Amino acid sequence: WIMGHMVNSIAQIDEFVNLGANSIETDVSFDKQANPEYTYHGTPCDCGRDCLHWENFNDFLKGLRKATTPGDSKYHEKLILVVFDLKTGSLYDNQAYDAGTKLAKNLLEHYWNNGNNGGRAYIVLSIPNLNHYKLIAGFKDTLKSEGHEDLLEKVGHDFSGNDDIPDVENAYKKAGVTGHVWQSDGITNCLPRTLKRVRLAIANRDSGSGIINKVYYWTVDKRSTTRDSLDAGVDGIMTNYPDVIADVLSESAYKNKYRIATYEDNPWDTFKA
C-alpha cells in the first residue's frame, strides 16, 4: 500500500492517486462537541508541504465517495484504502465515545450513502491516544444501532502514538478489538527515526499470536528509507511522494517480492509468503 500523506482537500485526492498512491491519509479535526469538523492538519507539518489545505469534513467525504464509487466520473479504481488520522488531542478523554458516534454517523451518511452504493474503500480509524479507545466502541455501536453492522467489515484500526506494542495490545483488549489492526510507526519527514519499533511490530504481526495484521511506516520520502522499509517487511509506506515509492517497487530487488495492492487484497489479512 502506497499511502499518500496529508491528503486534506478534494483536489489532492486526484493529485496523489495520479502519482501512484493506492491509499491516502486524511487528517480529521474535531470541534468542542466532538463533531468531526475539518480535514485539516495545520502548522507545523512535514517539511516541504503546504500544511493549510482543508475541506469541511462532510464535503471531503462526498468527494472521497465519488473517487471510490465505481461508475462515478471521478472514480479511481486503484484508491482502495483511506486512513483517517483522527486529531483527538483537542478532546477530553470522556468525549472519545461521542467522537466515535459522530464520526460513524457522518461516514454513514456522506461516505457510505446510508448503505446505498456508497464508496467502496476500506477505512482505517487512526487514533493518536491509547486512552481514547472508546472511540472505537462509539463507532461500532452506532453502525450497529443504525442497522449497518455489515459496514464494519470495511473498517480497521490503528493507534498512531508510537506506544509500546504491549500497551497497544492492551488498549485493543479494552476496546474489544480482535482483528482489522494496522500498526503505524514513524515521525515527520523533518526528523530521522530508526526502524527498531517497526521491526517489533512486524515481529508481532508474524508471530501468529499478536494482534497486528499490517504494519506501515511514515513519513518516507527518500529512496534509501523506502528500501530499508521494504527490507524490514512493511505492508505500507506513507509518503509525500508516491512516485518515489512506486519507482523503488519497480527496482529489480523488489519487483518480484512486492506488488501494489488492489481491491481484491483484503487489508485485514496478515500476509503469509
Swiss-Prot record:
Its main location: secreted. InterPro entries: PLC-like_Pdiesterase_TIM-brl (IPR017946). Keywords: Cytolysis, Dermonecrotic toxin, Disulfide bond, Hemolysis, Lipid degradation, Lipid metabolism, Lyase, Magnesium, Metal-binding, Secreted, Toxin. The keyword Signal does not apply. GO terms for molecular function: lyase activity; metal ion binding; phosphoric diester hydrolase activity; toxin activity. Its EC number is 4.6.1.-. One of its GO terms (cellular component) is extracellular region. Binds 1 Mg(2+) ion per subunit. It is an enzyme of class 4 (lyase). It catalyses: an N-(acyl)-sphingosylphosphocholine = an N-(acyl)-sphingosyl-1,3-cyclic phosphate + choline; an N-(acyl)-sphingosylphosphoethanolamine = an N-(acyl)-sphingosyl-1,3-cyclic phosphate + ethanolamine; a 1-acyl-sn-glycero-3-phosphocholine = a 1-acyl-sn-glycero-2,3-cyclic phosphate + choline; a 1-acyl-sn-glycero-3-phosphoethanolamine = a 1-acyl-sn-glycero-2,3-cyclic phosphate + ethanolamine. Its cofactor is Mg(2+). Expressed by the venom gland. Mg(2+) binds at residues 25, 27, 85. It is found in: Secreted. The active site is at residues 5, 41. Disulfide bonds join 45-51, 47-190. GO terms for biological process: killing of cells of another organism; lipid catabolic process. Belongs to the arthropod phospholipase D family. Class II subfamily. Dermonecrotic toxins cleave the phosphodiester linkage between the phosphate and headgroup of certain phospholipids (sphingolipid and lysolipid substrates), forming an alcohol (often choline) and a cyclic phosphate. This toxin acts on sphingomyelin (SM). It may also act on ceramide phosphoethanolamine (CPE), lysophosphatidylcholine (LPC) and lysophosphatidylethanolamine (LPE), but not on lysophosphatidylserine (LPS), and lysophosphatidylglycerol (LPG). It acts by transphosphatidylation, releasing exclusively cyclic phosphate products as second products. This is Dermonecrotic toxin LruSicTox-alphaIC1c. It comes from Loxosceles rufescens (Mediterranean recluse spider).
